[in-house]
UniProtKB/Swiss-Prot annotation:
GO terms for biological process: rRNA catabolic process; rRNA processing; tRNA processing. Pfam families: RNase_PH, RNase_PH_C. NCBIfam families: RNasePH. Phosphate binds at R91, G129, T130, R131. InterPro entries: ExoRNase_PH_dom1 (IPR001247), ExoRNase_PH_dom2 (IPR015847), ExoRNase_PH_dom2_sf (IPR036345), PNPase/RNase_PH_dom_sf (IPR027408), Ribosomal_Su5_D2-typ_SF (IPR020568), RNase_PH (IPR050080), RNase_PH_bac-type (IPR002381), RNase_PH_CS (IPR018336). It comes from the Bacteria. Belongs to the RNase PH family. Its EC number is 2.7.7.56. The gene is rph. It catalyses: tRNA(n+1) + phosphate = tRNA(n) + a ribonucleoside 5'-diphosphate. Homohexameric ring arranged as a trimer of dimers. This is Ribonuclease PH. GO terms for molecular function: 3'-5'-RNA exonuclease activity; tRNA binding; tRNA nucleotidyltransferase activity.
Length: 243
């Protein structure tokens, strides 16, 4: 998978975009990250609230939830704010639930105690892969937030059990490729989003044949690409948190 002429960006089929993770991007939230997957840029914040949803009252455990949104001009043409329309789109609800599920997969909510960690992922520029960038950045923001809780003595230990990151893969021009940008995503035959832990466990796989159905062989190739890409993202998360 070394053919770079296949992809509009000139990347190899197995090559991520340039990924940057900038911590402490804003000053108020307990965790605040700017994550960049090429030209896709997302601000991810983690905020701690000393309360839990009603269904968790008196159970002593915590909760983690996520919200996702896009600025009106994050894409090629301006879109109205969802608040102005009075409701969230189905896509927005799907993505924020995915982010929440992905992060809860690596959290011991009992260790978090009776508090809620709110993750807010705001896309300031979109060029494909906003949900996968959000998950990858939100983990780092959440890690910073719980580190502060431990340092302040509000919890005895970190509730984080592993790393988690996400990446898109797809079949573009008949070839499995890693980390689709907008040009590839809008023209691919297959689009798949994969969420995995640092230990290599699958948290979620979302795959759709946009054009021709994909074979089991292609699916295996896509998952291999995703696993390698997520391994690199976890390395970048570790490096950011150790900086």
């Amino acid at each position: 998978m070394t053919n770079s002429s296949l992809r509009p960006s000139g990347r190899r089929a197995d090559q991520l975009r340039d990924v940057r993770i900038t911590r402490h991007y804003t000053k108020h939230a307990e965790g605040a990250v700017l994550v960049e997957f090429g030209d896709t840029k997302v601000i991810c914040t983690a905020s701690v609230a000393e309360r839990v949803p009603e269904f968790l009252r008196e159970r002593g455990q915590g909760w983690l939830t996520a919200e996702y949104g896009m600025l009106p001009r994050a894409t090629h043409t301006r879109s109205d704010r969802e608040a102005a329309r009075g409701k969230q789109t189905g896509r927005t609800q799907e993505i924020q639930r995915l982010i929440g599920r992905a992060l809860r997969a690596v959290f011991d909510l009992n260790a978090l105690g009776p508090r809620t960690l709110h993750l807010d992922c705001d896309v300031i520029q979109a060029d494909g892969g906003t949900r996968t960038a959000s998950i990858t950045g939100a983990f780092v923001a959440a890690h910073d937030a719980v580190t502060k809780l431990v340092a302040a003595g509000r919890i005895a230990r970190s509730p984080i059990t592993d790393y988690v990151a996400a990446i898109s893969v797809g079949v573009f021009g008949g070839t499995p490729v890693l980390d689709l940008d907008y040009d590839e995503d809008s023209a691919c035959d297959t689009d798949m989003n994969v969420v995995m832990t640092g230990a290599g466990g699958f948290v979620e796989v979302q795959g759709t044949a946009e054009g021709a159905p994909f074979s089991r062989t292609e699916m295996n190739a896509l998952l291999d690409l995703a696993q390698a890409g997520i391994g690199e993202l976890v390395r970048l998360q570790r490096a950011a948190l150790e900086a």
